[in-house]
Amino acid sequence: MKPFCFSLSGIYESEGYAWEQAGKIWDLRELRGTDGYLDPETEQFLEAELGRKKETKELPRIRLLDSGNYHYMSKLLLGLEKEDLFLAVFDHHTDMQPPALLPVLSCGSWIRDAAGAYQNIKGICVIGPPEASVRETEAMEHVWFVTQEELDDGSGAAKIKEVFASLSLIHI
């Protein structure tokens, strides 16, 4: 299956991404209000278009979301899911920061926003942020962290196994 690519910044072109490897490309580079923070009007447009693409089966399950400035697209895509789910996120950031100014969706807040918005998300495990970032993050029910330090010292693997086992996703 070939990936569906969201082209928002031009990163694929600058990195020499082979477009022939992509299944479909949605060129959104001209869309305003998307760099790091998502304008509410643009968010409504994207939600409607993503819903349409899902209904018409134009949205395969493998998706490339551009650079880290557009991680908030994950929150919009999670909004399309109706079944219960558990999300594993590999990132060096918690992506659970409250917005600095206005209550807008951002690349740094999308996990926090998704955890609070969708009842079908039964758990989120964020794997990779530094311990200092996790300490600064407001705790939320059903959100777990495996820090970079835990990965480095080897204790992270056991913690990941515990998290998955507590959700009955694997049997120990």
List the predicted regions and their residue ranges:
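Short, charged/polar "capping" segments at the starts of alpha-helices
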Residues: 12-16, 132-137
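Active-site histidine-anchored catalytic micro-motif
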Residues: 63-131
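…; additionally, a secondary subgroup of soluble metalloenzymes is captured
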Residues: 1-7, 14-18, 57-74
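Active-site-flanking structural segment that lines cofactor/substrate pockets
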Residues: 28-60, 66-67
